[in-house]
Curated annotation (Swiss-Prot):
It is found in: Cytoplasm. NAD(+) binds at D146, T175, D232, G257. One of its GO terms (biological process) is 'de novo' pyridoxal 5'-phosphate biosynthetic process. The lineage of its organism: Bacteria, Pseudomonadati, Pseudomonadota, Gammaproteobacteria, Enterobacterales. It catalyses: 4-phospho-D-erythronate + NAD(+) = (R)-3-hydroxy-2-oxo-4-phosphooxybutanoate + NADH + H(+). Its main location: cytoplasm. It comes from Escherichia coli O127:H6 (strain E2348/69 / EPEC). It is an enzyme of class 1 (oxidoreductase). CDD domains: ErythrP_dh. HAMAP family: PdxB. Belongs to the D-isomer specific 2-hydroxyacid dehydrogenase family. PdxB subfamily. GO terms for molecular function: 4-phosphoerythronate dehydrogenase activity; NAD binding; protein dimerization activity. GO terms for cellular component: cytosol. Substrate binds at S45, T66, Y258. This is Erythronate-4-phosphate dehydrogenase.
Amino acid sequence: MKILVDENMPYARDLFSRLGEVTAVPGRPIPVAQLADADALMVRSVTKVNESLLAGKPIKFVGTATAGTDHVDEAWLKQAGIGFSAAPGCNAIAVVEYVFSSLLMLAERDGFSLHDRTVGIVGVGNVGRRLQARLEALGIKTLLCDPPRADRGDEGDFRSLDELVQHADILTFHTPLFKDGPYKTLHLADEKLIRSLKPGAILINACRGAVVDNTALLTCLNEGQKLSVVLDVWEGEPELNVELLKKVDIGTPHIAGYTLEGKARGTTQVFEAYSKFIGHEQHVALDTLLPATEFGRITLHGPLDQPTLKRLVHLVYDVRRDDAPLRKVAGIPGEFDKLRKNYLERREWSSLYVICDDASAASLLCKLGFNAVHHPAR
């Protein structure tokens, strides 16, 4: 049994070698010749999986180690009788922590408290729900917009997008990309929406590039609209609008979900799905894969305020480390993918062990996802 895996999927060689012969290949572009005798293909979001790639090939199963699936033609796979699995929620924690890192940086730079801001969350799936929970743990007001969930009658106080635009100081997008249909998200943030944002608002896109109309956004910024922008995703990736990058406050190369934990979850989820597909079901404990953290233990005295939270968050991950490299190489062919391929190891907040002498600080840090314990001062 021959299994092709994206060369940038961590732990893929070790895990899938338990099931068959593993060949690691680049994800963009996939070497088509390798597909001629392969039984399974494991990809990431950079690989377009469709009829033109797989027609006439012996592939029986496709796995994507990503939460999003808009790069996969699921309807064609089903029609062709090819098994499929994604990894929903695998990188949700990472994306939430990316958003926090960005917001805390902007709050420090511009001198505002997040408690004084209302956050509008567009898309309340694995990422949006976790983001809502962490923001509300901090006492920050959130507004939710998710028409598909609202129409299904899912639990939640869902509002219209217009209401979020009117009332939110921060608008952050966490939707799939739907190019048509009743829940179309292509250019959901169009010129009209962008121009309608509150003065001084913050716009964040960490889902799919085309959810925000990049051309319209650049037009508004060029005209001097008072708006802070965080973009991790771009229309036309791996190409991007260099002029837009110059205008945004934070720009990164589609790495919001790139924690070691998130990548490992993605790989293990598709591994487990494929092992079940072939009748040799196996399960993997995530902590058996992850290396020891680089941190020892941190001692925190007193309550948790915003400056202290910012220091803890940025100790684990400061978004500026990914903004600067992109600006240096933007516009150079191949460099966007190279930044992603050679991405520095990044951990999640759970990797930081915090000893608190304040019980409320320890409790709050645990709610936020840190590994915190309370030890009263002696």
